[in-house]
């Protein structure tokens, strides 16, 4: 019989590295192996525990309450604040929207006002819960415009959203003005600090200029903050914090309408593994406030160094002014951003391409963590080489006939055969019979084709791609 752990390690060889500070999306590396060891041991110790019933596993309840308490101190939360440990930022956002909707049962057509830069999880919440997402354009600095946000609010608005920071550009919205406008109309204001909530408080302590964004701002009613990002905890935890218990009440669920146990949940999940909770608690206990200050200092030092590298390279510029640890770069017409992405990836630096949106050109996203600091000189060299290679390769051009064909398509009317043809033409094949992912070695042409498609067509193509990826692999008889 084969060793499953040996096969597991072989499978993992195809994944992006989670350590080494070179994967600048999806993972957040502290650069400290001891933090990883503590997390692994805590997760393993609680892998079989179930946070479904806090009276059955009171240790998990204690850990959750202590995590929320640590976050409350970071977020300037009042003594009345309460919080919930969720499975990730998307669930925190889903619950914030669900709670806002259900707190206003008299509103039959609920709406929420979002900056165009708000995280896509709010669109998911709108889809799940039947809340209309009212998108408001941002200014040239990529921050929400408070006056335009205020004008979009009406009697059916149940939630107003601001980002701290926005994922795509790394800037903090003017929370003070937005929250004041929401409060004046009696509307909840949620600050999405999923990616900034555990690092921005230390930015202020380090003397960096950060717009006000915490519960210290009057009118902010709830905040989401992910612990698996800049708390450097294991994947699978986030926090949703409310200013007071009354604001959380609509989020809680109970059902005694069946013959089994009375279901009682504070999240969308019932069964919740104790592993991520214990892993997160152990990491936060180990690092502590002073440790997080040191890690934040390293992350911001890496940000400053990377920004300097980008600004030094002809043809590159930083998009917006980073308030946090997210850096967005764009290119001029002398080189193609998608080719530049491929070149960086080929040199061991995973960066995330962002497609054009509205008037904004394609860009490249970097989530910088403390573990990146030790490698910034390597990044500088890789960036210089990648820029030269991308410039020499020239732009990736999508045939005009293909562009016209894509623009004429209605994604709602396409059949599975149509999608198969489009996916094959784009290079997004999917998975083979043995479940292996099949993608081209370089993604520039794929991204260029997606870039000329409308957002609706991108969504349809990528959902078709995901459907073809997730197909069962059967064992031979």
Give a label for each model feature.
Residues 56-60, 83-90, 114-116, 320, ...:
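Active-site nucleophile and cofactor-binding loops and adjacent substrate-binding regions
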Residues 64-72, 94-101, 123, 176-179, ...:
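Predominant activation on well-ordered alpha-helical scaffold segments within soluble catalytic domains
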Residues 80, 87-254, 261-266:
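Conserved PLP-enzyme active-site core in the AAT-like
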Residues 81, 314-317, 350-355:
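A short linear hydrophobic-aromatic micro-motif
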Residues 126, 182, 310-311, 344:
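A generic structural signal for well-ordered alpha-helical segments
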Residues 1-61, 65-69, 330-477:
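Non-catalytic terminal extensions of PLP-dependent enzymes
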Residues 205, 209-325, 329-334, 477:
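Active-site C-terminal subdomain of aminotransferase-like
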Residues 79-80, 320-326, 357-363:
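Short Gly/Ser/Thr- and Asp/Glu-enriched loop/turn motifs at secondary-structure junctions
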């Amino acid at each position: 019989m084969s060793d499953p752990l040996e096969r597991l390690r072989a499978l993992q060889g195809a994944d992006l590295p989670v350590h080494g500070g070179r994967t600048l999306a999806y993972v957040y590396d502290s650069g400290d192996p001891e933090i990883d060891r503590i997390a692994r041991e805590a997760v393993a110790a609680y892998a079989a525990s179930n946070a479904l019933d806090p009276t059955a596993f009171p240790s998990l309840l204690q850990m959750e309450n202590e995590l929320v308490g640590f976050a409350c101190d970071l977020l300037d939360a009042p003594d009345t604040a309460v919080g919930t440990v969720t499975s990730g930022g998307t669930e925190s956002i889903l619950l914030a929207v669900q709670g806002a909707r259900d707190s206003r049962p008299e509103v039959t057509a609920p709406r929420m006002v979002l900056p165009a830069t708000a995280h896509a999880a709010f669109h998911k919440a709108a889809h799940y819960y039947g809340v209309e997402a009212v998108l408001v354009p941002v200014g040239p600095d990529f921050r929400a415009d408070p006056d335009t946000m205020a004008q979009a609010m009406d009697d059916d608005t149940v939630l107003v959203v601001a980002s701290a920071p926005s994922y795509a550009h790394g800037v903090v919205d003017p929370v003070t003005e937005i929250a004041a406008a929401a409060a004046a109309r009696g509307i909840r204001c949620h600050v999405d600090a999923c990616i900034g909530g555990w690092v921005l408080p230390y930015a202020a302590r380090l003397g960096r200029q950060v717009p006000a964004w915490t519960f210290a701002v009057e009118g902010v009613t709830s905040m989401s903050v992910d612990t698996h990002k800049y708390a450097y905890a294991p994947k699978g935890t986030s926090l949703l914090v409310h200013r007071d218990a009354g604001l959380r009440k609509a989020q809680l669920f109970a059902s005694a309408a069946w013959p089994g146990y009375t279901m009682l949940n504070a999240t969308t999940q019932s069964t919740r593994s104790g592993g991520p909770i214990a892993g997160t608690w152990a990491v936060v206990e180990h690092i502590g406030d002073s440790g997080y200050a040191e890690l934040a200092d390293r992350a911001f030092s890496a940000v400053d160094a990377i920004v300097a590298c980008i600004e030094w390279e002809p043809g590159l510029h930083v998009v917006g002014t980073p308030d946090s640890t997210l850096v967005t770069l764009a290119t001029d017409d002398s080189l193609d951003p998608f080719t530049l992405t491929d070149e960086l990836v080929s040199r061991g630096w995973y960066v995330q391409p962002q497609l054009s949106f509205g008037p904004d050109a394609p860009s490249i996203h970097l989530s910088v963590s403390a573990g990146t600091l030790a490698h910034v000189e390597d990044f500088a060299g890789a960036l210089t080489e990648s820029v030269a290679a991308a410039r020499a390769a020239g732009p990736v051009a999508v045939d005009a006939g293909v562009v016209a064909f894509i623009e004429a398509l209605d994604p709602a009317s396409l059949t599975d055969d149509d999608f198969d043809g489009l996916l094959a033409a784009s290079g997004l094949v999917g998975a083979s019979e043995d479940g292996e992912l099949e993608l081209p070695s370089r993604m520039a042409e794929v991204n260029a084709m997606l870039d000329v498609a409308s957002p609706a067509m991108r969504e349809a193509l990528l959902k078709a791609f995901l459907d073809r990826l997730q197909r069962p692999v059967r064992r031979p008889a």
